[in-house]
Amino acid sequence: PYARKAGDYVLRNATGYKLPRKLKVAFSATPEDTACATVNDMGFIGGIHEGRPMFRLWLAGGMGGQSALGLPYDAWVEPTEILYYIEAMIRLFMAEGDYENKGRARTRFIPRRMGVDAFMECYKKHLREVRESCSFEGIEPEIFKEASWDSEADHPWMIPQKQKDLYTVVLHPLCGQLFIEDGEKILKMISEIPAAEIRLSMDEELYVRNLSKAQAEALLEAMEERMMMTKVRMSVSCIGTPTCQVGVNQSQALCRAIERAVAAADMDETRLPRIYISGCPNSCARHPVAALGFSGCRIKAGDESIEAFECHIGGKVGMDTSVMAKKAGVIPAEKIPGMIVELGEKLSEEKKSYTEAAADGTAEAVIKKYCQ
């Protein structure tokens, strides 16, 4: 209920704020940090502290120009008090944000200007003022009381829920583009399941929830030919050009080209990671924290300007484990699908996971061969 309450509060009061630019608040339920709480303006991650469910808090992170990991706050946050912390960050942003330079108008630039210690003291000052001037209603927690159970999930994209005998199916359309006929087919299959619901993920997936084992298996079987079933084919791409007005390259075209190349190679693709593709230096596909990511740019080829992508490797997101990816070089767009195939073949040859290959330099050695 906490993310919903935070969203309702900010929207209800939005007309009263004058912010330099946007401020994002993320909530993750587990240390895996699937909502990227550690790389946002504000991020809450649930955990257990002294036997009670509470939140860890990160501040002033963000992706885009000069991306930055969030700064960990030095105390646990009571779940019922999150609105005090959010309002304090909004007030700090209004007071200290840059209204003159749009390129430096996000919260991640404030600690760089003030220093981390001064920023944290400033935040605590605003938090004290909010506590003195505001009185927020408590948030009623949603408590799950059912006992654990032994699931029978035998498919990687069928997830057992906490609720006994219920499963979630993960469906990923190519490049996150769901065709109307596929959506209608999914809707028809679940329309007579009263408790079924669909949630969307940050990785362009549909989570179809509250299914029995038989219903989950039937949905997977029906959609298997239309949905992507390996991590590399479940890659994430922003919309890119020509739809995006500020985009540089056709990120969707690259995503589709990678999928075609992997399929044509008839190789073991299970060792390849999910790839995050942004069509420009902005981070709509979260390439700055990707294990393998690309951001669009242009390079000269003779007298022509051609599409290319800067490659980012080694990124990771997690509670206390988030790492920014490093830049490995720039690759012409037309060469990237072949590079991905060669990387997959190298992983199979050496029997390594991509994580191992990224750590020991094997992956970077393949990537460097294609860099300009």
Q: What role is predicted for each listed range?
A:
Residues G7, L23-A26, F136, E140, ...:
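Non-catalytic interaction/regulatory segments
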Residues Y17-K124, A290-K352:
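Mobile "lid/hinge" segments at catalytic clefts and subdomain interfaces of large enzymes
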Residues V317, L347-K352, E356-Q372:
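Radical SAM enzyme core and accessory elements
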Residues S67-A75, W157-Q177:
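Short glycine-/aliphatic-rich beta-strand segments at the starts of folded cytosolic domains
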Residues P1-M54, Y84, H172-E304:
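Small-residue-enriched alpha-helical segments and adjacent helix-cap loops
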Residues R56-L59, R91-M94, E152-W157, K188-A196:
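Short amphipathic beta-strand starts and helix->beta connectors
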Residues M94-K162, L206, N210-L219, R226:
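Terminal amphipathic helices with adjacent charged low-complexity linkers/tails
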Residues D33, F44, I48-G51, W149-L166:
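N-terminal basic/disordered segments at the start of proteins
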